[in-house]
Amino acid sequence: MSQVILDLQLACADNSGLPDEATFQRWLEGVLPQFQEEAEVTIRLVDEAESNELNLTYRGMDKPTNVLSFPFEAPPGIELPLLGDLIICRQVVEREAAEQDKALEAHWAHMVVHGSLHLLGYDHIEDDEAEEMESLETEIMHGLGYPDPYLAEKDPL
């Protein structure tokens, strides 16, 4: 039986209306057990200022972003179930959901799925990597009961 441990940190000025811990747990459990038996992830929900600062510091981009992934790297010879941290910006997620005409809950779920796959080593820099990652995201989102998160982007009206 797999075990997923979540450390949820709420660092927004207004934490009302955010998905609850059980919902974040369900999303993680929809992703991680497919890849490893045990996993521990911190999800920190932040405002634009913190997202912007972290994005500038670690990616050189002076703007807030939807999700940042910080994989944990254990010292050689030490095995821990700690995968890493996801930093998710509330305002960016809410704005993107509205702009893309997506259900807010589904977009939150997508950010957790997307970020978790980054923690597991997936990326989307090269086209073939992006295709593999998007395919996994779509499959996982369907398993969680959500539509293809890329459908609207792939098939504009």
Swiss-Prot record:
Gene3D superfamilies: Metalloproteases ('zincins'), catalytic domain
GO BP of this protein: rRNA processing
Localization per record: Cytoplasm
Origin species: Serratia proteamaculans (strain 568)
Cofactor(s) demanded: Zn(2+)
Note describing how the cofactor binds: Binds 1 zinc ion.
Protein name: Endoribonuclease YbeY
Role played: Single strand-specific metallo-endoribonuclease involved in late-stage 70S ribosome quality control and in maturation of the 3' terminus of the 16S rRNA.
Its EC number(s): 3.1.-.-
GO cellular component: cytoplasm
A molecular function GO annotation: metalloendopeptidase activity
Primary subcellular site in the record, as a coarse category: cytoplasm
Keyword check for Metal-binding: yes
Keywords: Cytoplasm, Endonuclease, Hydrolase, Metal-binding, Nuclease, Ribosome biogenesis, rRNA processing, Zinc
A Pfam cross-reference name: YbeY
InterPro entries per the UniProt record, alphabetical: MetalPrtase_cat_dom_sf_prd, YbeY, YbeY_CS
Binding residue positions for Zn(2+): H114, H118, H124
Family: Belongs to the endoribonuclease YbeY family.
